[in-house]
A protein has these predicted regions:
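Generic structural signal of hydrophobic/aromatic residues within well-ordered alpha-helices
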Residues: 22, 84-87, 207
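C-terminal end-helix/capping segment
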Residues: 200-210
Length: 235
């Protein structure tokens, strides 16, 4: 499929030794990742505990988000590029989600990382919806922001038709990235916009100026590879 492709690869590591090794690789592999042929915007990120959204790090799960010129190149690089092969060789399991951008609002580190596909940015029949949010939290507001997370996690656990979710970040406490995959856009909208903890936290964040930067992006899921929690994602 022509056009830009965004990938999110999640790796799970078991055992203290493998987790310590992977923590070290987060520093060692930054330059090798940047030298990967055809890679555009990219981030290596850790994840949180609970359902993934809490600020306390989960040293067992690490992720790579990357932008590629096409889905074909994305598939080839996430299978064979040195960083992916190195992480995969040590991981208990890994899975990659392939996406095309529908919409993007805001910036990430001063960059506009995702380019919406053409023509009209809408889901095609059979495509699932992925949503990514990213925020830089003001240090003085971090406590207020993170205090809302447990209630949001409880609501997400009860949400209809959410197929995958993970919380990530570059710096614990100060950066939060949320990612989720939904069967239908209507179910995502019901979770995000209906009265409840997520809506209340979002309203307070913008009304009270909790963030120095924020981004919201929607994607069409066009494929997946690998296994997660013992099963193929099936996207």
């Amino acid at each position: 499929m022509a056009g830009e492709c965004v990938t999110l690869t999640c790796f799970r590591f078991d055992g203290t030794l493998e987790r310590v090794r992977q923590f070290g690789r987060m520093g060692l592999d930054r330059r090798p990742l940047a030298r990967t042929p055809d890679i555009g915007f990219h981030r290596m990120m850790g994840t949180g505990t609970g359902l993934g959204f809490r600020p306390r790090p989960n040293f067992g799960v690490w992720t790579i988000l990357a932008v590629w010129p096409s889905a074909e190149i994305a598939q080839e690089r996430t299978e064979s590029a040195p960083v992916w092969r190195r992480w995969r060789a040590r991981a208990a399991e890994d899975a990659t989600i392939f996406m095309e951008t529908l919409t993007r609002r805001g910036e990430w580190g001063g960059e506009a990382p995702f380019t919406p596909r053409e023509p009209a940015p809408a889901l095609r029949q059979g495509e699932k919806l992925a949503v990514l949010t990213r925020a830089t939290v003001k240090a003085a507001r971090a406590g207020a922001f993170w205090s809302r997370v447990p209630a949001i996690e409880d609501a997400l656990a009860e949400a209809r038709d959410v197929r995958f979710h993970v919380g990530m970040g570059e710096v614990p406490w100060l950066h939060q990235v949320t990612f989720s995959v939904w069967d239908r856009e209507e179910d995502m909208a019901a979770f995000a916009h209906a009265a409840g903890p997520h809506r209340e936290a979002a309203d307070d964040a913008f009304r009270r100026g909790w963030f120095t930067e924020s981004l919201f992006a929607r994607f069409a899921v066009i494929g997946s590879a690998g296994r997660w929690r013992g099963a193929a994602l099936g996207f």
